[in-house]
UniProtKB/Swiss-Prot annotation:
A GO biological process held by the record: proteolysis involved in protein catabolic process
GO molecular function, one term: ATP-dependent protein folding chaperone
ClpX-type ZB domain residues: 1-54
Keywords, alphabetical: ATP-binding, Chaperone, Metal-binding, Nucleotide-binding, Zinc
Protein name: ATP-dependent Clp protease ATP-binding subunit ClpX
Family: Belongs to the ClpX chaperone family.
Residues bound to Zn(2+): C13, C16, C35, C38
PANTHER family on file: ATP-DEPENDENT CLP PROTEASE ATP-BINDING SUBUNIT CLPX-LIKE, MITOCHONDRIAL, ATP-DEPENDENT CLP PROTEASE ATP-BINDING SUBUNIT CLPX-LIKE, MITOCHONDRIAL-RELATED
Binding site for ATP: P123, T124, G125, S126, G127, K128, T129, L130
GO cellular component labels: HslUV protease complex
Binding partners and assembly: Component of the ClpX-ClpP complex. Forms a hexameric ring that, in the presence of ATP, binds to fourteen ClpP subunits assembled into a disk-like structure with a central cavity, resembling the structure of eukaryotic proteasomes.
Free-text function comment from the UniProt entry: ATP-dependent specificity component of the Clp protease. It directs the protease to specific substrates. Can perform chaperone functions in the absence of ClpP.
Length: 427
């Protein structure tokens, strides 16, 4: 009798029929019960269906051609035609491979298409980060920027390399499938170069050690990411993210690498026919960077295995005065357009830059050696006083920025609107 009573009190899963003693958890609903095992099974089914839907969605949406990718880059990045062409082809091939991944895996020819990660080499402010950002926006994929200088080997003070994937997961709203098709841009990659050519007895945790840690991540591995971010702790659950199909773009200025290239070129030059390069000639410097070889990067401090994971190399030229002026006025989100819109919000005030003022701004950026990155700070300094006073000044129609003919100082000139004539009151 007691056994029957116990059986009557025992609860069972409405789906698989297991009793509450056979499962870890039994959740009650309105007149039904479901066990933890059935919940896991349902989650797996939903996850698989979402994955199929995402793949179908990707295959239906048209992938822009290299020409279309390059045209979009032209709207935001001035110059750098060679780098844009290389990037357009590399990114197109990468996402074409992803869209046809199921066909490739099902193929009988056993040809495995490996991904081609990208290395961007160019001076500060030449457009490396902007190129990567524009590509991610065009392709509508998660994008994250990581600073190589903050990375250290696991177990040391600093950021673990897997934190990069954690940030990418956050950028994709914790959608693992979406994150696994994203783009990671690692900036300042030249700063993790090996400190010396000879192996050291002391561990190089922020140089060669980081390169070693990045190898598997860039090539493809199952990265374990804490669900809510933060540092890893024992006994906690992790989200597994496969980095095999994540596109890694690494960028760096590689200051001084031109000397390494020049030294190699001089060794191969024979007699009086060898080219003599003027170090102060910017055009020649750009030409030198275009001749970069893997051995130059090894000499600089990157390990051969790391260079091997970045087969596509694109060099960006140093921007000259004309290019900086173009950057100020031509791109879709040009700085002059941005500040003009900001001023128009102040009661429709028009902002105008005289031609000589643009030349002065470009020359100041060249003097600071910060490339296009320095343009915004120069504009902020120039417009600070007028932006401070403008909300308190009445009846302003236009602000003109012109350059002084004596000392190249930038001066804002305020133009007031004509006061409307008052109608005579009839009494």
């Amino acid at each position: 009798m007691s056994e029957k009573t116990n059986d009557e009190k025992l609860l069972y899963c409405s789906f698989c029929g297991k009793s509450q003693r056979e499962v870890r958890k039994l959740i009650a609903g309105p007149s039904v019960f479901i066990c933890d095992e059935c919940i896991d099974l349902c989650n797996d089914i939903i996850r698989e269906e979402i994955q199929v839907d995402e793949t179908a969605k990707l295959s239906k949406t048209s992938l822009p051609t290299p020409h279309e990718i390059c045209e979009t880059l032209d709207q935001y990045v001035i110059g750098q035609e060679s780098a844009k062409k290389i990037l357009s082809v590399a990114v197109y091939n990468h996402y074409k491979r992803l869209r046809n991944l199921s066909k490739v895996n099902a193929g009988s020819d056993d040809i495995e298409l490996a991904k081609s990660n990208i290395l961007l080499i160019g001076p500060t402010g030449s457009g490396k980060t902007l190129l990567a950002q524009t590509l991610a926006r065009l392709l509508d994929v998660p994008f994250v920027i990581a600073d190589a200088t903050t990375l250290t080997e696991a177990g040391y003070v600093g950021e673990d390399v897997e934190n990069i994937i954690q940030k990418l997961l956050q950028a994709s709203n914790h959608d693992v499938e979406k994150a696994q098709r994203g783009i990671v841009y690692i900036d300042e990659i030249d700063k993790i170069s090996r400190k010396s050519d000879n192996p050291s007895i002391t561990r190089d945790v922020s140089g060669e050690g980081v390169q070693q840690a990045l190898l598997k991540l860039i090539e493809g591995t199952a990265a374990l990411v804490p669900p809510q971010g933060g540092r890893k702790h024992p006994n906690q659950e992790f989200i597994q993210v496969d980095t095999t199909n994540i596109l890694f773009i690494c960028g760096g200025a590689f200051d001084g690498i031109d000397k390494i290239i020049r030294a190699r070129s001089e060794k191969s030059g024979i007699g009086f026919g060898a080219d003599v390069i003027n170090q102060n000639d910017r055009k020649e410097l750009n030409k030198i960077l275009g001749d970069i070889e893997p051995e130059d990067l090894i000499k600089y401090g990157l390990i051969p295995e790391f260079i091997g994971r970045l087969p596509v190399v694109a060099t960006l030229r140093e921007l000259n005065e004309a290019a900086l002026i173009q950057i100020l006025i031509e791109p879709k989100n040009a700085l002059v357009k941005q500040y003009s819109k900001l001023f128009s919000m102040e009661g429709g005030v028009e902002l105008e830059f005289r031609e000589q003022a643009l030349v002065t701004i470009a020359r100041k950026a060249l003097a600071r050696k910060t490339g296009a990155r320095g343009l915004r700070s120069i504009l902020e300094e120039t417009l600070l006083d007028i932006m401070y006073d403008l909300p308190s000044i009445k009846n302003v129609s236009k602000v003109v920025i012109e350059s002084s003919s004596t000392n190249d100082d930038l001066q804002p000139i305020i133009i007031y609107a004509e006061k409307p004539k008052l109608a005579r009151s009839s009494k």
